[in-house]
């Protein structure tokens, strides 16, 4: 008896080790060391002050959406996931803003979910297949499936991973209490559902999945429909789940003031189409597309919004054959649900978690691969169920069974290689956007993101090319039009810049960033009154637009209205303390006015929010040097040079400090370093070095006399 227990324990440990190993081979093994924040990570984490500000702003975390905007704002997508945001914030507080460790935690959560899935399937009662084989094969497929790459390798996929964990825990609770779902179990499941909804809204479907699982595990499907209905009406736990779900939904809507999100056409062209038939047919086709991505995850793309999926405009579109095929399978499953309950259970566990993303409510995407993380649990169950049913039906044909085993091993190998390849794409934005261009060459958003990244990398030729291509594919793409205008402005083509920014405003008149950028162009043209009017228009559409206040300050500076300039810069940093240019302008103005003590005090405030910003540190060092606090100034200059070692100005000013300090040899070395970096830019260093050497020469001559 003990030997059997030991063997079972050993077998269990081996199975779990294999599953974890598959996860690590697909996503880990040193592949995370060079990981960066990509795509949605930038908005939700890097630029989200709820995540990367200390001390913790609890009010903001529980009143803002996942992207850092107020939940009650008209611009908010209403994606309320405060516990996910809080997880990111805790990681930032403990370990800093590092994509590698955040993605590693995602990988650990994926390992945990894989093991929970294996444990869940082992505990099921499904008479037509071996649950032991069903468990290990389904969990292995779940571990290796490429559709999970976005959820695991994209940091914002944490919401899906936590939803998946809570979903599986609730299903395990349901199985453990089959036939005796009392108030304690029901209450715990509803509590976990409420917690899950604070990680991801789709967790509201958990009670429905639990009811589905309990229905099949209790064998209610054997009864006649009349008897089933009578029994289900008397199940207090099912009624409790229904009322609890409605209560959670009501509370969730109340928290956002019962306002619905508004999405642009670029986010979801299907939902914005004016024809009911086109919307309906296209939405049905998208359902099949999601299934196809799980069935054949070769073509994967980080954004399917513009140009990836053509709308289905009539019933004769051949793509609807896939829709007919899917509903045929569902119909066959319904007709055989008493004979093949495992298939029906797997199908239900695939469909139920997907309902919030299925088009029942308007969402801000066409297809989002990470939303398939939890539905893929049911898909993996269904796929392996079909394989085992086919395999077990071929008992007399050993060659065929051998061929099936080989095919299964090949499938797992291909899946693992594809997942590893896709995980590499998600390491940085350049690889990610390049991979998307191969899948969706006519996706305007892909071209837009490539252009944006090229601009950041200084490749303006490439940026111009892809911005123009994005606009060619989608002429009313307001963000692309505005950014192209900004690019022309940086190249001094102000008239062309104004033209494109005005086109952006024609496409979207309530676009605050476009109004602000129009103001910047008009200010550069000397049209100060028009620029001021544009800035005020931007503030009309976004009242707390910190960057706009900064640019208004610059406008007043150009008009020599110094008090108003200072006031607007101060207002900008009050709204958003992470604006280094605004802080630098404030400090420079105070320094120029001779208010060095005020400049030091303000620089301390600035460094609390931006401790490693070189512009603020540099100005503080200059002020300290003027006040003859040489030791402290020297330390800050050295820190600035450590952060940016190839900046001639920093070495020059360090030389000036030593010059004033009568540290002649150190001054000479600093000046020479500045000249060696860039002789053309080190004019001041050359002049100061020449003066210093001449002075030393004169002193030497005097000494000789």
UniProtKB/Swiss-Prot annotation:
Segments crossing the lipid bilayer: 18-38, 92-112, 136-156, 159-179, 186-206, 236-256, 286-306, 315-335, 347-367, 371-391, 401-418
Residue intervals annotated with topology Extracellular: 39-91, 157-158, 207-235, 307-314, 368-370, 419-705
InterPro entries reported for this sequence: O-mannosyl-transferase_TMTC, TMTC_DUF1736, TPR-like_helical_dom_sf, TPR_rpt
Highest taxon, organism lineage: Eukaryota
Keywords: Endoplasmic reticulum, Glycoprotein, Membrane, Repeat, TPR repeat, Transferase, Transmembrane, Transmembrane helix
UniProt cross-references to SMART domains, sorted A to Z: TPR
Membrane topology: Multi-pass membrane protein
Location(s), subcellular: Membrane; Endoplasmic reticulum
Reaction it catalyzes: a di-trans,poly-cis-dolichyl beta-D-mannosyl phosphate + L-seryl-[protein] = 3-O-(alpha-D-mannosyl)-L-seryl-[protein] + a di-trans,poly-cis-dolichyl phosphate + H(+); a di-trans,poly-cis-dolichyl beta-D-mannosyl phosphate + L-threonyl-[protein] = 3-O-(alpha-D-mannosyl)-L-threonyl-[protein] + a di-trans,poly-cis-dolichyl phosphate + H(+)
Glycosylation sites (chain numbering): 57, 459, 688
Pfam families reported for this sequence: TMTC_DUF1736 (PF08409), TPR_11 (PF13414), TPR_12 (PF13424), TPR_16 (PF13432)
Enzyme class label: transferase
Enzyme Commission number(s) of this protein: 2.4.1.109
Residue ranges that the UniProt entry lists as topological domain Cytoplasmic: 1-17, 113-135, 180-185, 257-285, 336-346, 392-400
Function: Transfers mannosyl residues to the hydroxyl group of serine or threonine residues.
Protein name as catalogued: Protein O-mannosyl-transferase Tmtc4
Organism: Drosophila melanogaster
